[in-house]
Amino acid sequence: MANSTGLNASEVAGSLGLILAAVVEVGALLGNGALLVVVLRTPGLRDALYLAHLCVVDLLAAASIMPLGLLAAPPPGLGRVRLGPAPCRAARFLSAALLPACTLGVAALGLARYRLIVHPLRPGSRPPPVLVLTAVWAAAGLLGALSLLGTPPAPPPAPARCSVLAGGLGPFRPLWALLAFALPALLLLGAYGGIFVVARRAALRPPRPARGSRLHSDSLDSRLSILPPLRPRLPGGKAALAPALAVGQFAACWLPYGCACLAPAARAAEAEAAVTWVAYSAFAAHPFLYGLLQRPVRLALGRLSRRALPGPVRACTPQAWHPRALLQCLQRPPEGPAVGPSEAPEQTPELAGGRSPAYQGPPESSLS
């Protein structure tokens, strides 16, 4: 009885984990696809290339290593696909290359925003985005090549263990963890820390008096009106929101995976499934964190959604109940502007039942 209860509990936990993993997979595909469309159709974004690169990396990961985690890995995966040595090595290479490409891409995006905010008037000091992203992919390729130096994978009858934590890097695993997680974390922390410091200084700076502003009188009422509030608001609160979310999301998703890479192989294998899918959740969180928190992206997404959805049928205004204005309101196409009170046609003497409201009497020549 106890064994059956334990089996049922493990099956329920595996099913819930599989459902959550599938939700993360769908969210990564849909979110990054929608954000990539918005970025490509919005020419005003200054860091559009970094955002598009991050979306492409997330889509590649969601289309390659995440399905392998659902099909080939043990719970929360299905564990029904048995990969041979060559496909398993390819899966290790993709995992060891795409994860650093994602973390280094996030760090490059943070540094680009730091230069745009802190040094907006010095565009010559910014390296070209193509050069930065080329360096990111070169480093990711070298880190992925380290996975080919590990122990060979097991033959197909054994369970598929094709991740980086399953002996894919061998003695190079600590070096891979430092370059793939510690270095991007330090770069991201420095970039968003600088952004927060600059924003907080701007919030603490007193506003400049407007030109032509009237001087306050020295009366008691004027002194009471300019007293500070009893509960002063902490300056820089809004400025701390975006850096805190970016750094917190990076630490929550990637810190467990990096610590597992530095742990012994036995403990890393025990926590492999949990830390792997926590890291994979970053692919689904990036569109909301780096896309929807930007006002230009939200505005562009709203414009695209309004163009895609059919427009609502406009109703007639209550001021346009004149028969001729009502006939025009019913006959015009739905996309036309609504007839307002200033646009309603004037009443004719025939429809008004005699003289028009603007009738002022006979001309002066007839009175003489």
From Swiss-Prot:
Keyword set, alphabetical order: Cell membrane, Endosome, G-protein coupled receptor, Glycoprotein, Membrane, Receptor, Transducer, Transmembrane, Transmembrane helix
Record remark on domains: Lacks the conserved DRY and BBXXB motifs. The restoration of these motifs affects its constitutive activity.
PANTHER family found in the cross-reference section: G PROTEIN-COUPLED RECEPTOR, G-PROTEIN COUPLED RECEPTOR 62
Q: What is this protein called?
A: G-protein coupled receptor 62
Give its localization.
Cell membrane; Endosome membrane
Q: Which residues are exposed on the Cytoplasmic face of the membrane?
A: 40-53, 113-129, 199-239, 294-368
Q: Which Gene3D superfamilies match?
A: Rhodopsin 7-helix transmembrane proteins
Tissue expression, as annotated, is: Expressed in brain; detected in the basal forebrain, frontal cortex, caudate, putamen, thalamus and hippocampus.
**Residue intervals annotated with topology Extracellular:** 1-18, 75-91, 151-177, 261-272
What's the chief localization of this chain?
membrane
Q: Which Pfam families match?
A: 7tm_1
